[in-house]
Amino acid sequence: MPRPILATIHRPALAHNLARARSAAPDARVWAVVKANAYGHGIEHVFDGLRSADGFALLDLAEARRLRALDWRGPILLLEGCFEARDLELCSRLSLWHVIHCNEQIDMLAAHKTQVPHRVFLKMNSGMNRLGLRPERFRAAWTRLNALPQVDEISLMTHFSDADGPKGIAAQLRAFDAVTHDLPGERSLSNSAGVLRHGDELAARSDWVRPGIVVYGSAPDFPEHSAADWGLQPTMTLSSRIIGVQELAAGDTVGYGSSFTADGPLRIGVVACGYADGYPRHCSTGTPVLVNGVRTRMVGRVSMDMITVDLTPVPDAGMGAEVTLWGRSSGGAVLPIDEVAQTAGTVGYELMCAVAPRVPVMTE
């Protein structure tokens, strides 16, 4: 039989979370962000759960082709725009909208010969200092784009660096408004944290919102808020089973480096999941795990193919017992991915994206 590890994608949870994002921005149209292969879930696996979105936002042409192959005929937005001039022809062919974040992309568009005018989102660098034109250069870029026959419509956008924390969005919002207040075009400012934490403040500038991580059931501002606090449901469950049991005596150690020592008799289960499956190697003793839906802890180091868990809270668990590494157990108990990520010093986004190709995936 196959190794018992499995990633399960929950389509009803995707639909629920998308509706939750929409309820926080009821007057906006929603880009469901499916970059990075839908945050590791698989574009094909999430599509049915997210098909009520007004559009899909992603990074590259290969992902856009996959959406069109699923018979999606609505808007698709390339969040990083076009990388080469030849990409513009594919944008025309696939009816893609694309971001313009630098003058070089305007140069490419000006030189592009097309019968199909492009819809573009002109991006301002309002303070995050990744992509975008600085405020003092933004209006000149807009004027130049507006004069191009290759351009049909210009929308305006920016991206917040601290919508999830105490610094907030005020400074970036002032920078954006100062330059764009009298420019026409739709606006798109809100990411996941913007939608949930600043919905009222941004409502007048939210023709489009761009929820990403919230769609996949993770809190954008954890640990201040949990996914449950925001009414989100887990969309990915990583599960496995116990494939071995050991009875330890006081002083016995576990795993590489003997990093865990039993302080008394202890029964542990060996789980078919390791860092080669995408489980974070930096997780250590105390990382939460569910066994038969009961919360317990990992002990020792994460190995390539295995972890070990304390069976004290589940004395009846043995060979074949269900183990939930994150997500929802078969009985409905939930282990938030954010909690597991926190113990590894990372974020839920990374865990979702890091599930290894060798892990089978099913949808429900």
From Swiss-Prot:
<protein>
    <recommendedName>
        <fullName>Alanine racemase</fullName>
        <ecNumber>5.1.1.1</ecNumber>
    </recommendedName>
</protein>
<dbReference type="InterPro" id="IPR001608">
    <property type="entry name" value="Ala_racemase_N"/>
</dbReference>
<dbReference type="GO" id="GO:0008784">
    <property type="term" value="F:alanine racemase activity"/>
</dbReference>
<comment type="function">
    <text>Catalyzes the interconversion of L-alanine and D-alanine. May also act on other amino acids.</text>
</comment>
<feature type="active site" description="Proton acceptor; specific for D-alanine">
    <location>
        <position position="35"/>
    </location>
</feature>
<dbReference type="InterPro" id="IPR020622">
    <property type="entry name" value="Ala_racemase_pyridoxalP-BS"/>
</dbReference>
<dbReference type="Pfam" id="PF01168">
    <property type="entry name" value="Ala_racemase_N"/>
</dbReference>
<comment type="pathway">
    <text>Amino-acid biosynthesis; D-alanine biosynthesis; D-alanine from L-alanine: step 1/1.</text>
</comment>
<feature type="modified residue" description="N6-(pyridoxal phosphate)lysine">
    <location>
        <position position="35"/>
    </location>
</feature>
<feature type="active site" description="Proton acceptor; specific for L-alanine">
    <location>
        <position position="256"/>
    </location>
</feature>
<comment type="similarity">
    <text>Belongs to the alanine racemase family.</text>
</comment>
<dbReference type="InterPro" id="IPR029066">
    <property type="entry name" value="PLP-binding_barrel"/>
</dbReference>
<dbReference type="GO" id="GO:0030170">
    <property type="term" value="F:pyridoxal phosphate binding"/>
</dbReference>
<dbReference type="GO" id="GO:0005829">
    <property type="term" value="C:cytosol"/>
</dbReference>
<keyword id="KW-0413">Isomerase</keyword>
<keyword id="KW-0663">Pyridoxal phosphate</keyword>
<feature type="binding site">
    <location>
        <position position="304"/>
    </location>
    <ligand>
        <name>substrate</name>
    </ligand>
</feature>
<dbReference type="InterPro" id="IPR011079">
    <property type="entry name" value="Ala_racemase_C"/>
</dbReference>
<dbReference type="InterPro" id="IPR009006">
    <property type="entry name" value="Ala_racemase/Decarboxylase_C"/>
</dbReference>
<feature type="binding site">
    <location>
        <position position="130"/>
    </location>
    <ligand>
        <name>substrate</name>
    </ligand>
</feature>
<dbReference type="Pfam" id="PF00842">
    <property type="entry name" value="Ala_racemase_C"/>
</dbReference>
<dbReference type="GO" id="GO:0030632">
    <property type="term" value="P:D-alanine biosynthetic process"/>
</dbReference>
<dbReference type="InterPro" id="IPR000821">
    <property type="entry name" value="Ala_racemase"/>
</dbReference>
